[in-house]
Amino acid sequence: MTEQLNTNQQNDEAQFMIQRIYIKDLSYETPNTPAVFQQQWEPELKLDLNTTTTQLDKNVYEVVLTVTTTVMNQKTTAFLVEVKQAGIFTIQGAAASQLDHLLHSFCPSILFPYAREAITSQVIRGSFPQLVLAPINFDALYMQQLEEKQKATGAKDETVSH
């Protein structure tokens, strides 16, 4: 009887599985070479992140993390690298709020190290100094996004009610 209860408890939990991780798109540009190689190296990094999700089938989702890095050196673009790191994930038995968190925080945190490696590799191949992106707290970004949505919804509600 104990075994049956444990089995039922396990079935109530969300199940998560990585099916595949892959690069969907990769772009590398060095618009100001070779002049940028002659300058004193004083890089300024701009990092942009975006996540998109697509439901492919029942309980199967594609999550694409787009990471765009632009490095400026003395007010000129040294290089720009954009990678769309994707993954296909199976998620079963998750409540709506849990599913949203998995798709917009947990999955991107799985994809980011792969994107970071792809960016670092392209930068080195371009003969620039190694670029190591710091880890990103996707949970904090997700919570910030939820708060912004709640504030926007609250503002709409206030506008409608007045």
Curated annotation (Swiss-Prot):
Broad class of where this protein is predominantly found: cytoplasm
Biological processes annotated in GO: protein folding; protein tetramerization; protein transport
KW Cytoplasm (keyword) present: yes
Keywords for this protein: Chaperone, Cytoplasm, Protein transport, Translocation, Transport
GO molecular function: unfolded protein binding
Lineage: superkingdom: Bacteria
Protein name: Protein-export protein SecB
Originating organism: Legionella pneumophila (strain Corby)
Subunit comment: Homotetramer, a dimer of dimers. One homotetramer interacts with 1 SecA dimer.
Similarity-based family: Belongs to the SecB family.
Gene3D superfamilies, sorted: SecB-like
Acetylation keyword on record: no
Subcellular location: Cytoplasm
Taxonomic classification: Bacteria, Pseudomonadati, Pseudomonadota, Gammaproteobacteria, Legionellales
Function: One of the proteins required for the normal export of preproteins out of the cell cytoplasm. It is a molecular chaperone that binds to a subset of precursor proteins, maintaining them in a translocation-competent state. It also specifically binds to its receptor SecA.
Record-linked InterPro entries: SecB (IPR003708), SecB-like_sf (IPR035958)
Entry's Gene Ontology cellular component terms: cytoplasm
